[in-house]
């Protein structure tokens, strides 16, 4: 079934399918490999995005692909347009902050990967996933590739699709919650974002299971953090400064 939006910037809860972009080829081919990657695992706000891309061997090779984190926003947008035009099939799934809080970020990422692969399984006979874990319940054989977003072209493409989709959404969320400046940091734990959290408290897009958000919420409610978790929470703040 074809499911799409005009701009791709829609939060898709984990209980729903992702955004599926079909091709005219209905039979999976074991020679066609889906590259899978995520964006937004570490931010304090917004969804985690997972994309899967299967290249069309009959279309020209896309030059300039790389890990999305190594590209400028302008370059990512340019490559995104080429990827979705030349891909045999692609899908992107967004798991929202509420679902992340309910099942945790690791499980949300695994679920997003499974749904993204499901979106291209009518074409791809194999999935190659960035990282060191293969989600359970995939519709085709798969392997994990550590550092795959710098090694495999399909994974590079998936990282770009996931990143661009998520960044577009964060710009949209900025118009709803301008006080947090989601357009600048995309939900990551920057000084500007942390200061806004302290001033305004969390909005519905914040991940309350993440320590800095939980601390801000507790502070506004006049609650003391659990003393045994202070060191862990400080460690998590440091880990979340850089995009994952």
Swiss-Prot record:
Highest taxon above the source species: Bacteria
One MF annotation (Gene Ontology) recorded for this entry: RNA binding
UniProt cross-references to Pfam families, sorted A to Z: RNase_HII
Reported cofactor(s): Mn(2+); Mg(2+)
Catalytic function, reaction form: Endonucleolytic cleavage to 5'-phosphomonoester
GO BP field: DNA replication, removal of RNA primer; mismatch repair
Cofactor note: Manganese or magnesium. Binds 1 divalent metal ion per monomer in the absence of substrate. May bind a second metal ion after substrate binding.
Listed GO CC annotations: cytoplasm; ribonuclease H2 complex
Enzyme class: hydrolase
Ranges where the RNase H type-2 domain occurs: 31-222
Location in the cell: Cytoplasm
Main location group: cytoplasm
Record keywords, A-Z: Cytoplasm, Endonuclease, Hydrolase, Manganese, Metal-binding, Nuclease
Enzyme Commission no: 3.1.26.4
Residue positions binding a divalent metal cation: 37-38, 130
Similarity annotation: Belongs to the RNase HII family.
NCBIfam families cross-referenced by the UniProt entry: PRK00015.1-3
Protein task: Endonuclease that specifically degrades the RNA of RNA-DNA hybrids.
Protein name: Ribonuclease HII
Primary gene name: rnhB
